[in-house]
Structure formats: structure tokens, C-alpha cells
Amino acid sequence: MSEKAVVVYSGGMDSFTVLNTAIQNGLDVYALSFNYGQKHSKELEVAAHVCRKLGISHKVVDITAINSLMANSSLTGDAEIPEGHYEDDNMKSTVVPNRNMVLLSMAIAYAVSLEAGKVYYGAHSGDHHIYPDCRPEFVEAMNAVSKIANYQSVEIVTPFLHSSKGEILKAGLDMNLNYANTWTCYNGREKSCGKCGACYERLEAFAEQGKTDPLEYEA
């Protein structure tokens, strides 16, 4: 019987690669997505489609009821999504307060209920500058907490914590993954904007690998 693992799966290219990495590692994967009121909720539709195709368990948890407690982010509020490079300081407006701690806490609870020993999520080096809850010290602290918060110890696994977006893409391409089955743009429109930090980072990754992004862009 395969070991169970929960994968925090947004529908973006990082978590898509993590999801498939866990599957390739022979784990019995339970994908977990969250609706926290993000403008780019299209990612949840993509996540559901991928999980149906893979035939794996997928839960989408609606936590919009606590949205007012996680306010002041351009991803969930009225502020415009900033344009520019993903390491520019204006991208700090896309930080959702305490998001990954909240999401990982629920993922750990789900893992305990499943008797799963691992929770995977897609933190990577490109997020370290802007997002405190994607940094190595955060992962280390969450791992320490997850080992003592319940009778069952759960390990937080971040396969790409020290990898760039380009390196994540290379790992996925080596697995023959189709990145048309992902959504990255922070704007929730029909096509990717090509101007937000998330789009910039994605396009840089494809350029770094000498590949063309299969998604359509407005610009």
C-alpha cells in the first residue's frame, strides 16, 4: 500500500510540478486547494481539471469566510494587481497575511485525518524576496510545529525550496508535463496579462529553458 501525502495544489505551475513529483515518487496523493477569495480563482478550475485527468482525490476548501481577517492584499481586495518584475517592492501588495501558515495548518489537519505522513507545497527561491511564508526559515519552523501539534508527526516537504522557477520548469519538462494545464496570472481574466509579477516570472522561466509558454497572453 502506497504512503499517503497531501499536496497543497493551487493550479499554478509550481504546485503542478510538485503534485506530479509526489505522484512520480509513488505516493498516494490527496490534492488540496483553497478558495480564499483570490482574483485569479481560474487556477482552481485548472486544478480541478488536472485532478480529474489524473484520477486523484481533490478537495477545494472555501475559506472566504475569513477573508476579512486576511485583508490588505491586492490578490483579494479592491487594489489593482501591480505590474512589473516579481522582485520589485510593489509586489509586496500581493502578500496575503499569514496565508501559507493558515493553508498549511489545514493541510496538516487533513494529513492527520488521512494518516498521511507528508504535506507537500511549492515554495521556491523566487518567492523568498517578497513572501516571508515561502522562506526556508518559515518552512523549518512549520516543520517543527507540525511534528508536535498532533499525536501524529507530519513532515512539510518542499522539493523546490532552493530552486528557481526555471529549474522547476525544467524538472517538469523532464517529466513531460504539459504546462497548458496550469494558471499563473494574478489577474482573473480570460487570458494571462503578461505584465504582473507572476506572469513575468513565468515568462522568464520559459525563456530560460528556450521554450514557448503554451498559454495565451494579452500582451
Swiss-Prot record:
Enzyme class: ligase
Cofactor binding, note field: Binds 1 zinc ion per subunit.
Pathway(s) per entry: Purine metabolism; 7-cyano-7-deazaguanine biosynthesis
Reactions mediated catalytically: 7-carboxy-7-deazaguanine + NH4(+) + ATP = 7-cyano-7-deazaguanine + ADP + phosphate + H2O + H(+)
Keywords: ATP-binding, Ligase, Metal-binding, Nucleotide-binding, Queuosine biosynthesis, Zinc
UniProt: ATP binding residues: 9-19
Residues forming coiled coils: none
Protein family according to the UniProt entry: Belongs to the QueC family.
Name listed for the protein in its UniProt record: 7-cyano-7-deazaguanine synthase
Organism: Marinomonas sp. (strain MWYL1)
Lineage per the UniProt record: Bacteria, Pseudomonadati, Pseudomonadota, Gammaproteobacteria, Oceanospirillales
